[in-house]
């Protein structure tokens, strides 16, 4: 539906971002897209692959919204120190792109609020990581 309206898909949840991003990447393969379009045809739809799946961090940062965030902050969060947990799904990127791009963008967005970003040694681990350590 996004493609039919000339729009990209913007996702807030990291897990949903990865699922939709991976699906979109798979649909770049002609055979997969043909198979999917055979099914979509029954619903009167077709997918051409023109829409991109973007994380909200990309949209806010790359579409020039970071300056708007700075402008809209009326009470800077100067006394707030934040440790960001990116989660592994935020690192999904197109081939050849910098996997640290979105985490850096998120840091800049947090800083735009006036808050300080502090290092966190587990910042890029999967949010499901603690479950894997339960039996230890």
Residues covered by each model-derived region:
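Iron-sulfur cluster-binding electron-transfer modules in prokaryotic oxidoreductases
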Residues: 1-136
């Amino acid at each position: 539906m996004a493609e039919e309206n000339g729009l990209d898909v913007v996702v807030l949840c990291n897990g949903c971002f990865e699922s939709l991003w991976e699906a979109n990447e798979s649909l770049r393969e002609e055979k997969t897209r043909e198979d999917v379009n055979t099914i979509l045809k029954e619903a009167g739809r077709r997918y051409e692959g023109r829409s991109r799946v973007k994380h909200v961090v990309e949209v806010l940062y790359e579409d020039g919204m970071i300056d708007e965030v700075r402008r809209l902050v009326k009470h800077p969060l100067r006394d707030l120190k934040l440790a960001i947990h990116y989660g592994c799904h935020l690192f999904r990127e197109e081939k050849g792109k910098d996997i640290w791009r979105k985490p850096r963008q998120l840091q800049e967005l947090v800083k735009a609020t006036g808050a300080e970003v502090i290092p966190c040694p587990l910042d890029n681990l999967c949010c499901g990581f603690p479950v894997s350590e339960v039996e230890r």
